[in-house]
Amino acid sequence: MRLTIEVIKERIVERKLFKRNRKSIEVKILAGLLYYLGLSLRKVSLFLSQFEDISHESVRIYYHKIKEVLNEPERKERNLIAIDETKLKVGDKYIYAWSAIDVETKECLGVYISKTRNYLDTILFVKSILKFCSNKPKILVDGGKWYPWALRKLGLEFERVKFGLRNCVESFFSVLKRRTKVFYNRFPNNSKFDTVISWIKSFMMFYNWMKSLT
């Protein structure tokens, strides 16, 4: 099913996603989308308040909640999956954001946030994306030493690739970094780990939605 605004609206109503329904559903969807596309919470609030009064806190809530009605990746046979990770700053500390992209469809199959970057993180992340694969796909990775043992442990074929087919996962991180640049590539000091996970999961879901429309 093509994920249109009408389908999203129907899902929001059916699942009673928002406790209060004083604002139109269309404005809530638009708020989440504009924030994903790069506007700050306050700028989204200022713009949409020309139609309905919306606080920047409401925009934040819409962005985090709407992912619940966007499409999860479909479970199907997949040939090549590119995996990578990048650093993001939360307060004065760094975390790792992992991503897996289907090389053929360019769909993001999953994101994973960790405070470390090791074999266990690799296994946990790869296991989480295999639920969207009906087969054992080939994994494309860079030179990270945390990949080989973990992927062999999972019985997966893999190949080290620096460029070419792995460009799709680099492109995902490029879009992510462009988005986090709005707050200087740094989540606020008071950001909880769960909040950061939810933010990046929302980003992934909006990313896939936009990809599906092109």
Swiss-Prot record:
It comes from Methanocaldococcus jannaschii (strain ATCC 43067 / DSM 2661 / JAL-1 / JCM 10045 / NBRC 100440) (Methanococcus jannaschii). InterPro entries: DDE_dom, RNaseH-like_sf, Transpos_IS6. To M.jannaschii MJ0017 and MJ0139.1. It holds the Pfam family DDE_Tnp_IS240. This is Uncharacterized protein MJ1466.
